[in-house]
Regions:
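Structural motif
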Residues: 162-166
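Aromatic (tryptophan-biased) beta-strands that constitute blades/sheets of beta-rich domains
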Residues: 1-39, 74-89, 125-134
Length: 166
């Protein structure tokens, strides 16, 4: 469906393009602020929001995820993975999260401390989590997961500290 934005690039093909045409040269001047959300941090917000079936999903610093009613801005739920603050010493370039992915009723999140987490998109409840890095090394995860042919793929960070990519 054209109005959905299910991953960082919009579609699973990562086109970074919306075919919708309601906003154009003639209508752009009529745009205004409908609502906004404040977060409990002043750290950088780098993730692309997702829009699915009337809900906006946003990831923020410390790997938190929020769901909002797109029309009203009402917060539907918040997920906090309780990322340990001590992980900050392993991070070179900011306590950030660069996005989430959605697939078949779940929101997928890579946490700063290296977990891949599946969150129920309707309730915000954690369904499962899996450690994806060697916790004894200087790994972190800041990138958005991708879904490819039903498989969730996540990369790691930490090259500044001599860890290997895999």
């Amino acid at each position: 469906e054209p109005a959905q934005w299910m991953t960082v690039g919009g579609t699973y093909e990562e086109r970074h393009y919306s075919p919708l045409n309601e906003v154009n040269r003639d209508t752009v001047s009529r745009l205004g602020l409908s609502w906004f959300a404040d977060y409990d941090t002043n750290l950088s917000q780098q993730g692309t929001p997702l829009y699915i079936d009337g809900v906006i999903y946003v990831s923020t610093a410390w790997s938190k995820v929020y769901a909002y009613d797109a029309r009203t801005g009402a917060q539907l739920w918040q997920y906090d993975p309780q990322t340990p603050k001590e992980i900050a010493i392993k991070v070179c370039c900011g306590i950030v999260n660069r996005g989430i992915a959605a697939y078949e009723g779940k929101i997928y999140l890579g946490t700063l401390d290296g977990y891949l987490v599946a969150i129920n998109a309707k309730t915000g409840q954690e369904e499962w989590r899996k450690l994806t890095v060697d916790a004894d090394k200087q790994y972190t995860v800041t990138s958005a997961p991708r879904v490819i042919k039903g498989q969730v793929v996540i990369g790691n960070s930490g090259s500044e500290f001599g860890v290997r990519g895999y």
